[in-house]
A protein has these predicted regions:
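Absolute protein N-terminus
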Residues: 1, 18-20
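Sec-dependent signal peptide recognition
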Residues: 1-7
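Short, aromatic-enriched amphipathic alpha-helices that serve as compact interaction elements
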Residues: 20-40
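A structured, charge-rich N-terminal accessory region that forms the first stable segment of a protein
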Residues: 40-60
Length: 145
């Protein structure tokens, strides 16, 4: 019963965020992303695949609605046994802010692979929105939002 209640609440809108800085938005996104990933992966292990993918896409759309400007089109969904974002393991290593644009760089510490992410944000009406997240490696930057 509790599981159903939590899932029916969904995600709050960007205006409901208690995040006033780019760093706070990034950390909140990491937390919500990890929750979405873990729920989607667990359901994928237990339920029918097509229904799970529809629910995962719905959850992803809610995440995008919460953290991006209206009309943003994200990348195809991807979830797995280990979340790509987790505020307990992915640490902010730099923040650059110039008026209404911010770049927050993070490092995700893992045993065999420690990816770097670059969160790009823009500010509109006193609210910071994600505009893209790039996975950064030696070969370039790859959009992942």
């Amino acid at each position: 019963m509790i599981k159903l209640v939590v899932l029916s609440v969904g995600f709050l809108s960007a205006g409901d965020l208690l995040a006033n800085t780019p760093e706070q938005v990034v950390t909140a996104f990491q937390r919500d992303y990890k929750y979405w990933n873990d729920q989607s992966f667990q359901k994928n292990q237990n339920d029918g695949k097509q229904e799970v993918m529809l629910q995962a896409q719905k959850g992803w759309n809610e995440l995008l609605k919460k953290y991006t400007k209206p009309g943003f089109q994200g990348e195809p969904i991807a979830f797995g046994s280990e979340s790509s974002h987790d505020p307990e393991q992915e640490k902010i290593i730099s923040v650059q802010i110039t008026e209404k644009i911010a770049v927050v760089t993070t490092k995700f510490s893992r045993q065999y692979y420690s990816p770097t992410y670059e969160y790009q944000l823009s500010k509109e009406n006193d609210t910071w929105y994600l505009s893209q997240i790039f996975l950064v490696d030696d070969d370039g930057k790859y959009p992942s939002l």
